[in-house]
A protein has these predicted regions:
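Mature catalytic core of soluble alpha/beta enzymes
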Residues: 1-245
Length: 245
């Protein structure tokens, strides 16, 4: 059962291949994504994050979800030596982590319903669980950032998450906090991890690091990466090819 919506201004796809799949469970995940969008969208003037940025919401009045996300952002900043930083010129923007977090939390809803085979995707960031309709691993294409209609790599996933960071993507403006400027050394980096939340936050940080970001991913246990540079050349971590065979 495959369903698609537009949420957060992005395409959202949920595909459950278990035979007992029902719309009610999938709609619950969509509702959760709407809830996250209302809290964290920097485009909505009445979102919780917008209220915070305008100084209209004191810390003591922040929701538990907001407090959790901001805490996770601070932890990620420390883990990435400051390259993951949600403070951009005085504005708080946790979008480099929220999408992956939302997808991962959404998959927990499906798991609680007893589903084991599904994928959940928001604009290319995916959590893939179990197997597809053919009983095989899920196939995920990596777009060519120079030609979005072209797939340059196909990876095979089960019980993994994948996320891509790149300034060619909608709404992506990743800052290099070390230079206090927009990160522009590379075009994109795709990260495979144990779940999409982890992949998303580290992909954001690795992109901000520029060319050395692939070395950062190489050093993370359980993660692999694929980087496309400005000259259209690509480099990957040592274990990335395991997912392309």
């Amino acid at each position: 059962m495959k369903r698609q919506r537009t949420i957060m201004g992005m395409p959202v796809t949920i595909n459950v291949t278990d035979k007992n799949a029902v719309d009610e469970a999938i709609n619950e995940v969509f509702s959760y994504f709407h809830y996250i969008d209302k809290k964290f969208s920097t485009y909505k003037t009445d979102s919780e994050i917008s209220l915070i940025n305008r100084g209209e919401l004191p810390k003591e009045n922040r929701s538990l979800e907001m407090r959790k996300i901001l805490r996770l952002c601070e932890e990620t900043k420390k883990e990435t030596h400051g390259y993951f930083d949600i403070n951009i010129k005085g504005i708080i923007d946790p979008s480099g982590l929220v999408k992956g977090y939302a997808i991962f939390e959404g998959t927990k809803i499906l798991k609680r319903k007893g589903y084991k085979n599904f994928y959940v995707e928001i604009a290319g960031d995916i959590q893939a669980e179990g197997l597809n309709e053919e009983g095989k691993k899920w196939k995920v294409g990596i777009q060519n950032p120079f030609n979005l209609k072209e797939i340059i790599k196909i990876i095979n996933l089960t019980n993994k998450g994948v996320a891509t960071s790149g300034t060619y993507l909608r709404g992506k403006h990743i800052n290099n906090p070390k230079k206090n400027a927009e990160a522009d050394e590379i075009i994109s980096i795709t990260v495979i991890g144990p779940n999409v939340y982890e992949a998303d936050r580290f992909a954001t940080a690795a992109f901000a690091m520029g060319k050395k970001g692939i070395n950062f991913i190489e050093g993370l246990k359980g993660f692999e990466g694929y980087m496309v540079k400005k000259d259209k050349s690509a480099v990957s971590t040592s274990g990335f090819s395991r997912y392309t065979n």
